[in-house]
Amino acid sequence: MEISWGRALWRNFLGQSPDWYKLALIIFLIVNPLIFLISPFVAGWLLVAEFIFTLAMALKCYPLLPGGLLAIEAVFIGMTSAEHVREEVAANLEVLLLLMFMVAGIYFMKQLLLFIFTRLLLSIRSKMLLSLSFCVAAAFLSAFLDALTVVAVVISVAVGFYGIYHRVASSRTEDTDLQDDSHIDKHYKVVLEQFRGFLRSLMMHAGVGTALGGVMTMVGEPQNLIIAKAAGWHFGDFFLRMSPVTVPVLICGLLTCLLVEKLRWFGYGETLPEKVREVLQQFDDQSRHQRTRQDKIRLIVQAIIGVWLVTALALHLAEVGLIGLSVIILATSLTGVTDEHAIGKAFTESLPFTALLTVFFSVVAVIIDQQLFSPIIQFVLQASEHAQLSLFYIFNGLLSSISDNVFVGTIYINEAKAAMESGAITLKQYELLAVAINTGTNLPSVATPNGQAAFLFLLTSALAPLIRLSYGRMVWMALPYTLVLTLVGLLCVEFTLAPVTEWFMQMGWIATL
């Protein structure tokens, strides 16, 4: 019997999301206008809490949908205006261009990145050295490329290798269901479990590597670009400004990588089984023999484009998004990708998040119009200048570990800039606060998948169920990194940021605008 109209509408609303989640959102949409009539300030904070809830529940439903409904209602009932939302979007156009074009541009360099990580995996036998190499490679790439893309490439490598061994273990040439272990005998299952543990640890090292590298440059994370623009910094300025905090954090993060592998803590330390290595090596040898001259030229061209990308960013030859567009044009032209649909695939990864970012800016507009963060900022600004840095870092860190970095970074840098423009803080203090905000937004956020977009991408990927990587296991494996990165970052903000920045100024390496 066909279901009723009401039941059909309920099923269509937010699709496969659980009923309790749908009900919660409906309650939010009913309650918000009523609270707004009584107290706009309370309603504003309620909206922020609801929006953070949708981000935290990203696995139940992509936040664009519920967050977008909340944002539309906020504009409709007068919490902010459509014009203010447009102004926020216009002010952050560079970030939208970064997400649209840079992420798509790197898509056309995936063959080179796959080649790099495959070589690393098969060339280095020491697990400690391999883990360190993955972490360093991910950090370096994330300093210039989008972290999501770097993680996507590592996922591609891992899924490919897992599939190769799974086919051998199941004795089937066509193994379409990688989650089906029923055809694998007991001996192979033991080896497969070890291989899963090995891949889990590598994926986590690579994921943390993207955070370590992403915090260092203005293109490493979308919020970095927002903060750099607000402070008026270019690529080199940003790197030097962050280095009093980010360089010690990078060193300690890499030492943590070695330590957890050596001591086999928190689920790390599993090595690549020799049987798996033999299978993968045979496959790689076969692939290399089949590689044509045309394939080799593609890799060389992509490497040259990579050099252009790094050079253009370092010398600030154009806006970041436009450099990304140049990468798309060069990579497609010189590697023979001419079909519109083939080019279109490059944009599927970035455009949903670009749309979500526009919704973020709607909520930011509400925060500004309702002056929601004014009490917090006033509390922080009442502290001494030295204490302000640590307080900004801590407040950013707490919110970033459960919410999205771009959202948090945008809110706090806007508030700090408003304080500077009103004369509450000096320009010099504002620049130090920008460093505290950026590092506070990026470093503690490795605590949960909600904080790091790259982690959330990994958790929701096809690889996660194959290697038994759940939300809880990811939080557990990230814990040593969370503690080290957060505490070292806080100590550096407290003790090294101001004196080292002062020394840089005396040396003439950086200047206050």
UniProtKB/Swiss-Prot annotation:
Q: Where in the cell is it found?
A: Cell inner membrane
User: What is the protein's membrane topology class?
Assistant: Multi-pass membrane protein
Per its record, the protein catalyses:
2 Na(+)(in) + 3 H(+)(out) = 2 Na(+)(out) + 3 H(+)(in)
What is an example of a GO molecular function annotated in this UniProt entry? sodium:proton antiporter activity
Which Gene Ontology BP annotations are present?
response to lithium ion
Q: Tell me the InterPro entries matching this sequence.
A: Na+/H+_antiporter_NhaB
Q: Which UniProt keywords apply?
A: Antiport, Cell inner membrane, Cell membrane, Ion transport, Membrane, Sodium, Sodium transport, Transmembrane, Transmembrane helix, Transport
Sorted alphabetically, which Pfam families does this protein's record hold?
A: NhaB
Keyword Cell inner membrane belongs to the record: yes
| Phenotype of the disrupted gene, per the record | At pH 6 and at low Na(+) concentrations, deletion mutant grows slower than the wild type and its Na(+) dependent transport of glutamate and proline is markedly inhibited. However, when grown on these substrates at higher pH (7.5), mutant does not show any specific phenotype. A mutant devoid of both nhaA and nhaB is extremely sensitive to Na(+) and Li(+) at all pH values, and membranes prepared from this strain show no Na(+)/H(+) antiporter activity.
Instruction: State what inhibits or activates this protein.
Output: Activity is weakly pH-dependent.
User: Does Nuclease count among this protein's keywords?
Assistant: no
Per the similarity annotation, which family is this?
A: Belongs to the NhaB Na(+)/H(+) (TC 2.A.34) antiporter family.
The UniProt function text for this chain reads: Na(+)/H(+) antiporter that extrudes sodium in exchange for external protons. Catalyzes the exchange of 3 H(+) per 2 Na(+). Can also transport lithium. Essential for regulation of intracellular pH under alkaline conditions. Is necessary for growth on Na(+)/symport substrates such as glutamate and proline under conditions in which nhaA is not expressed, such as acidic pH and low Na(+) concentration.
- Remarks, miscellaneous: NhaB seems crucial when the level of NhaA activity is growth limiting, when nhaA is not sufficiently induced, and/or when NhaA is not activated.
Output the PANTHER family linked to this UniProt entry.
NA(+)_H(+) ANTIPORTER NHAB, TRANSPORTER ARSB-RELATED
What name is this protein filed under? Na(+)/H(+) antiporter NhaB
Q: What is the species of this protein?
A: Escherichia coli (strain K12)
